[in-house]
Amino acid sequence: MNGLKMLLFSTTLLTAFTLHAQVTLKQQVKITDEGLHFDGRNLDFSNVGTPDTGEKYDFFFGPNISAHGDAVKTYKHYVFMTWYKGGKSERNVMLSRYNTLSGELSTIEFPHRHTGFRGDPLVGESHNTIGLSVSPINGTIHMVFDMHAYDNNNHDGKFKDDFFRYSYSIAGAAELPHSEFTLDKFVKDTSEVSQGENDYKHLTMTGDLSDKGNFARLTYPKFFTTVDGTLLLYMRLGGNNNGAYVFNRYDAETETWSTFTKFNENNQKLKGNPYNWGLYGNMKYVNGKLRVGFQQRSNDNSDKYKYQNGVYYAYSDHPDGFGDWKNHKGEPMTWPLINSDEIKVFEPGDYVSHTDANSVYIVGSFDWTVTEKGDIHIISKVRSTDRSRPDYEEVYIHSYKPAGAEDFIISTDFTGASEIYTSGDNVYIVGLEGGRPYVEKAQGGTNNFVRVYEASDGPTFDHGTLYIKDGKVYYYLMERTSGNAMPLYLQIIDLDLDLESDANAPIVSFPSPSLTVEQGFEKLSLNIAAESPVEVRTIQSVTLYINDELVRTDTSLPYLFGHGSKPHETGAMGWLDTHEPNPSPLPAGRHIFKAVAVDSEGDSSVATMMLTVNSNAPIISFPQESLEVDEGFEKLSLNISAESAVEGRTIESVSLYIDGEFVRTDTSLPYLFGHASKPHETGAMGWLDTHSPNPSPLTSGTYEFTAVAIDSEGEESTATMQLVVKGEPEPPVVTWPNSTVTVYEGYEKLAITIDAESPVEGRDIQSVTLYRNGELVRVDTRPVWNFGHSHAPYEFGAMGWLDRHDPNPAPLSVGTHTFTAVARDSAGLETESDMTLIVLSLPGPSVMINESDISLLTEYQNLSITADASTANDDTSLVSLALYIDDQLVREIYEPPFEWGADGYSNELLELSEGSHLARVVATDSNNKQSESSIFINIDLLGDLNKDSVVDKGDTRLFTAKLRAGETMDIRYDFNGDGVVNNRDTRGLIRRCTYSRCTSN
């Protein structure tokens, strides 16, 4: 019944809200048929080393990389979109610009190609999105792209001097004519770390390479534009359970970016927090402020959360976010943030009943926004980790705080969504259903979502990303087809905000946005204020709802609810002698009061108030909320406190449960469980000589103790306590970034940071000791546990890389070497982990013949062959390149250019006989290592047109036929030397006949 009433109410609101507005699709345009998409297998660490080498494009994390992330923005009447070009062998970064006035589409292809998961182009990575922005002040275009926490050293150094990718244009490029909107309007990198002549990627945004450390280990670029046109960029620093949000600022006047500033610290444990944590959410610039909303992922893998937990929110009153950060209540927070609890809003995990380790899954379907009026809206989802468990739970949550309210309203009456957006004072859910776009809308500060747009035809889409500006949705979508190149579309959906209608809507408010009363409250009279801002309009009605149930409609002033004639309508008991007790008073808990005012023109507005009814139920508590004991504990006595909050009531009983299993009911004070007469009921072994050992003690694990108190009126309350039974001592965990590392002999640098931590709260790592092939290298007693750094360059056998480093007198030789790291914690426990270092001998030189296979006719006059070669490293030099034809040495050259058959040696390749010849160029380096490259030289008999190894009348007939057919002939068939090949040259061909009879004929 409640669901039906909610549906009817929402339909009424839809009619009111759309009286002056109609959400419509204004434009749809295809951007390309070649958007990159990953259509292969979803790999993991067990099979990422063996990706598909054919057409299928395997991936890590997810299949989407085009129309994904911060990929669409507007500037004046242009829409800009970034994408990667498909298919698998292309992968170029692309930028498209759509002119909404002329319909003209311009596209720029950049040289850079998606590098793939950890540098493997055969494995796509969905996190490597392209962030995009255009400065409204100077028309520069900015792109940050294709990175996932890279730095100079990780992933075997594949991203050295290329771990951050930033491209930008000259001023004014955003609105250049179609013919001038070209790649050369972007600025090349000409620094000392440039990747080549066509490198448009910059390692820093400041232009100063000394800042490069500030741009390392970053992921997920997203740009914002402030109210004054300033560009901000935010990214995530670090990893999933130890990260930070960082942001920087663009000065359009000087055309320079600042370095990144942290919103929160990473490595929080080193700064006094009990644990490290990372962020899963967003930083956004919305309603004139920089704000942050996220879920936390800690490195505690033993709690009930599989990954994330909590909802956290903060905002800055500084125009660019550089300070003045506060929680949702307006209270100052530590900046940069260290303890996330300072800004915690609520815990979604409380909305499911599971308590066992890793049983609660809070990933995905999280987003937030803030309306122009200041209403905060946060959506999230919590479910059981194991979808197959019989008590599976799944809850979608919409938590919102109307402007002016003190606390959030937490509603589970929500169908769920992946993203939430705002425009004006409304909030919107925009998504795909059945592959087609839809839009749902609610007034800010409410949970009244109604569908206002739904596409019924057109392409079916796989996914998309969007940007909302000036009341329009710019929905950037990928069509659902097949393969690793799929079409991309732009849809422009007009929300038709009807700002004039919004400005004319009634002004309605409760006396207070929130109120608290005691259960059984006698009186609650609410005088709701409602008036029209338009002089000639009047208020026709004010309707009150409680928890979306219709209470009453009032059509005349004052709009008073809960007055003496209707004492029960606000949930009160009644306060006059003439009032019968309310048979259905509001129970303890939170209740949403909603007032809907309608004016004489049919415009409507909504106001909400949250009423908190404090419970009359018993007050019950354990001595502690949580407790830790060692496995085999002898005694656990729990004196549970229980009393009534209402004078005259008594406690009738207290019952104890462990993980839902009934233990015992106690009906008299003290409510003591686990006492000497019942030592085993709390899971203990027993502690007196008279106690037999418990046959079923609590073993290692986490248990939930629940106490239920019932008072003399039958009302009940519960309290919980978590008991952690610790098993055998847990040693520290030590891990290498890579279990196997491969280098070439003579390698200059190998620096590795080893991760070591204790899984036991309160313990610290005291030391990490490194051994090489069983021999002690060094004991490190201070984090970070870094070996092979610039002050100890030889620890992993490297030669040394700085000018001050003497060459290592004992570098590691070619072969396999074992390095062992031993971590010791403050309890004296140790763990070791091995890494295998494979040292390969240097490869020979690289050599390539520049020509492809060559085909010539006998009596040819010219033939030359060229080659290029390089050595494996700068310390090795090239000795020579030698050309062999059919294994016969032609000539050995000792310095470039490497060319045979030219200059003073023009005859050395002439007079090769008819047939096929193998040409090989052999390169030799200073290590006496060789490599070779080869081609075939095919010499055909001049005049042998039919390829039968003789020149005869068959060839003369074929020659004549080709001339009649107008085919182009080799100029060497111009036997009479008149500059053309025609019938007059037939006699010259006949004279070349192999047999005399052909000549006479």
UniProtKB/Swiss-Prot annotation:
This entry's Enzyme Commission designation comes to 4.2.2.-
Q: Where does Ca(2+) 1 bind?
A: 189, 199, 201
- Kindly indicate where the leader peptide sits in this chain: 1-21
**Single biological process term from Gene Ontology:** polysaccharide catabolic process
Task: Please name one Pfam family that this protein belongs to.
Answer: Dockerin_1
Q: Where is this site: Neutralizes the sugar carboxylate group at subsite +1?
A: 236
Residues annotated to bind Ca(2+) 2: 300, 303, 305
What are the alphabetically sorted keywords of the record? Answer: Calcium, Lyase, Metal-binding, Signal
Positions bound to substrate: 126-127, 280, 297, 361
SUPFAM superfamilies reported for this sequence: Type I dockerin domain (SSF63446)
Query: What is the active site of this protein?
Result: 127 (proton donor/acceptor)
Entry's Gene Ontology molecular function annotations: hydrolase activity, hydrolyzing O-glycosyl compounds; lyase activity; metal ion binding
What InterPro entries does the database record attribute to this sequence?
A: Dockerin_1_rpt, Dockerin_dom_sf, Ig-like_fold
Can you tell me which family this protein belongs to?
A: Belongs to the polysaccharide lyase 24 family.
Functional summary from the UniProt entry: Ulvan lyase involved in ulvan degradation. Ulvan is the main polysaccharide component of the Ulvales (green seaweed) cell wall. It is composed of disaccharide building blocks comprising 3-sulfated rhamnose (Rha3S) linked to D-glucuronic acid (GlcA), L-iduronic acid (IduA), or D-xylose (Xyl). Ulvan lyase catalyzes preferentially the endolytic cleavage of the glycosidic bond between Rha3S and the uronic acid GlcA, but not IduA, producing oligosaccharides that have unsaturated 4-deoxy-L-threo-hex-4-enopyranosiduronic acid (deltaUA) at the non-reducing end.
The name on file for this protein is Ulvan lyase, long isoform
